[in-house]
UniProtKB/Swiss-Prot annotation:
Residues that span the membrane, as ranges: 40-63, 73-97, 111-132, 155-177, 199-225, 247-271, 291-314
Localization: Cell membrane
Protein name, as recorded: B1 bradykinin receptor
InterPro entries given in the database record: Brdyknn_1_rcpt, Brdyknn_rcpt, CCR1-9-like, GPCR_Rhodpsn, GPCR_Rhodpsn_7TM
Region (Disordered): 1-24
Disulfide bonds, paired cysteine numbers: 109-188
Membrane side Extracellular: residue ranges: 1-39, 98-110, 178-198, 272-290
Glycosylation site positions: 13, 21, 184
Amino acid sequence: MASQGPLELQPSNQSQLAPPNATSCSGAPDAWDLLHRLLPTFIIAIFTLGLLGNSFVLSVFLLARRRLSVAEIYLANLAASDLVFVLGLPFWAENVRNQFDWPFGAALCRIVNGVIKANLFISIFLVVAISQDRYSVLVHPMASRRGRRRRQAQATCALIWLAGGLLSTPTFVLRSVRAVPELNVSACILLLPHEAWHWLRMVELNLLGFLLPLAAILFFNCHILASLRRRGERVPSRCGGPRDSKSTALILTLVASFLVCWAPYHFFAFLECLWQVHAIGGCFWEEFTDLGLQLSNFSAFVNSCLNPVIYVFVGRLFRTKVWELCQQCSPRSLAPVSSSRRKEMLWGFWRN
């Protein structure tokens, strides 16, 4: 079996040790050569956009004078998770450029891959929490308590970060740099101690990391859409109102973007697990899964720099927060501005 992508790179043949082209199947050498040449540039572009975009989003959330809402607490944590994630991408770009010859030592092998793996879980768990929050506000509005929900949101985010760290522990522990004589490289690989670990990994990655969260996301968002249709997006002010409708539009877009970007990776990761337990075999499935994992990994990477774009173009409340922050930092913000004048300025700013 050839290599997996950066999220769970395990350069391997039947002994789970050799990177791409070290197996008997080598039907797509040109495709691999193209990937080694082009993907590092793509990864660095994702890193640059993700670093700037998520730093901007976090700055807006953290520097604003107003206290963060529940939705904004979750969104700020999602931006922080994406920011931590993209910090590991330059290491992986160099690794791909070197054809998986890891140049940074065993410690960074564990740290970079562990952080990337933790982000996989943290991101999707945060999307579940965001969806559940919108579900609570729109479907069961009377049960929500604003002050109490803020404390719950903060505690939920802390638990999500802890869960992501715990679920990525095997990556921190079992990742290591090993020589692969067939290719004359030292690869950063995942050394599973027993074949039964492949089943555990399948449960962890595909079930806990995608299918169960996906079921929850679909449940919450289907009920949200049904509730919006019933109400014609006219929610009584005590239960939500225009502010919640705008937040819901942003969150539904984020959820859709997340699923589109991450679903291909989990599909190919599932195929890779089937290969490891010998449920599928043959050169076609080997090449198809290996190349698919590489490409789907980078479609998942796109999500980390796409979220800030969604905030700006879909999140009207986020844009308003940006404007308020600009006014706050401007010397002219010290001068009093009437409420009607502020509304007029904001309306003109976002119409243009």
